[in-house]
């Protein structure tokens, strides 16, 4: 950054979760295990969806993209974090910090609207089952994932530009384990009012708008389920939504604790703990939640283990 009072910033220092060398080695093992489980679980989910003919439906199409986003999401932060656990120089380049910040915002927003698309899919499946094939056609499904990717990356790029347009001086120590907006803003020595307002508006809008779509979809879904006379029918209809509802609750619950508030020293410290959950645990748990609660996925896994599901990969 250019300023008459300081030199160009070329790198930042990530303070991470702790400065205790012994604890860092323990955390390295813990987060490495979480990362490997995340990669294995989500890659397995993508492989199952692409190779098993019974999973070639809109619901699993969206789930495959959710798994892909979770892999990118975790991979954006974890490798650098693991490196810093074992390194004395806990630095990240200016370009690397910009990229990490951009990808983090972009992938979070993308996941918002993929989860919203999944809710719409469940709404159509339960409330309009006779029109499901036409209303959730391949073209519509492609649009429902393409738009979140495009919008997410445009939002991430614009928000990152606002952040890195700020002048940074004095300490360049980021009080976090990745390049997050709130602690970066606290390092700035230029006016941050526009950036703070933009962050609050964008985070608030995307959280509330995507959650509104999900809640409205489930309002109609529950109304339709309660009209089903048989208990078995109600249970079967609700079971198709249970995994998605669990993921939505975990993901949105933690994010609401972090971004819908102005940045402060206290909020940054709290957000580090919150961020551990949705950056590492949520991507690891998502495929497990769908696997344990979904008979189609369990059956597909059994078929894959027996070597019966490796047909031609669907395009």
From Swiss-Prot:
Keywords: Cell membrane, Disulfide bond, G-protein coupled receptor, Glycoprotein, Membrane, Olfaction, Receptor, Sensory transduction, Transducer, Transmembrane, Transmembrane helix. It is a multi-pass membrane protein. It holds the Pfam family 7tm_4. CDD domains: 7tmA_OR5M-like. GO terms for molecular function: G protein-coupled receptor activity; odorant binding; olfactory receptor activity. GO terms for biological process: G protein-coupled receptor signaling pathway; sensory perception of smell. Residues 1-25, 76-99, 161-196, 259-271 are extracellular. Its main location: membrane. It is found in: Cell membrane. Residues 47-54, 121-139, 218-237, 293-315 are cytoplasmic. SUPFAM superfamilies: Family A G protein-coupled receptor-like. Odorant receptor. Belongs to the G-protein coupled receptor 1 family. This is Olfactory receptor 5M1. It comes from Homo sapiens (Human).
């Amino acid at each position: 950054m250019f300023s008459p009072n300081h030199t160009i910033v070329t790198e930042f220092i990530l303070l991470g979760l702790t400065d205790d060398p012994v604890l860092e080695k323990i955390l390295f093992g813990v987060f490495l295990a979480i990362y490997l489980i995340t990669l294995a679980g989500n890659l397995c989910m993508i492989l199952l969806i692409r190779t098993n003919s019974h999973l070639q439906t809109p619901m699993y199409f969206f789930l495959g993209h959710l798994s892909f986003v979770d892999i990118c999401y975790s991979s954006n932060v974890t490798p650098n974090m693991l490196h810093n656990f074992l390194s004395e120089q806990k630095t990240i380049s200016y370009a690397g910090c910009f990229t990490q910040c951009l990808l983090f915002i972009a992938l979070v927003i993308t996941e918002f609207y993929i989860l919203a698309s999944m809710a719409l899919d469940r709404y159509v499946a339960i409330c309009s089952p006779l029109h499901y094939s036409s209303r959730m056609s391949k073209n519509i499904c492609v649009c429902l994932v393409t738009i979140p990717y495009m919008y997410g990356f445009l939002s991430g790029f614009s928000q990152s530009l606002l952040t890195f347009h700020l002048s940074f001086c004095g300490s360049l120590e980021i009080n976090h384990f990745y390049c997050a907006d709130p602690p970066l803003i606290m390092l700035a020595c230029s006016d941050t009012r526009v950036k703070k307002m933009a962050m609050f508006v964008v985070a608030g809008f995307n959280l509330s708008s995507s959650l509104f779509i999900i809640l409205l979809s489930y309002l109609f879904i529950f109304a339709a389920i309660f009209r089903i006379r048989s208990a078995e029918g109600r249970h079967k209809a609700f079971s198709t939504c249970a995994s998605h509802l669990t993921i939505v609750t975990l993901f949105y619950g933690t994010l609401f604790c972090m971004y819908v508030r102005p940045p402060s020293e206290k909020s940054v410290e709290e957000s580090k703990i919150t961020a551990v959950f949705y950056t590492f645990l949520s991507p690891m748990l998502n495929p497990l939640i769908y696997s344990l609660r979904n008979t189609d996925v369990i059956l597909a896994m059994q078929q894959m283990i027996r070597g019966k599901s490796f047909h031609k990969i669907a395009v």
